[in-house]
């Protein structure tokens, strides 16, 4: 599995995450995506200083169970909007079932969030 920043995203580039051990990675895949995608104020001084700045980044997962999943993170004035686009119906159903748990995990990290999960039909 590899998580890469989508071209055109605003913000500082993050290191891509790669894990070849799929069995061990399955449990941590989504958590790693969230931790990598959420912007950190110290690493993004303009957004930390100016509450009117909108900070947006997009990430795409390649390989593994979450292949094709895209995550868009938008930070504005202390509010985090997290949008997840899922091209596979079974993954979409799993994420919708876990939505409440995901929101509680993100709240424990100290973020005020809006979480939306969308099924995006694959055009292939």
From Swiss-Prot:
Keywords: Protein transport, Transport. GO terms for biological process: protein transport. Induction: Induced in low magnesium. NCBIfam families: PRK15351.1. This is Secretion system apparatus protein SsaP.
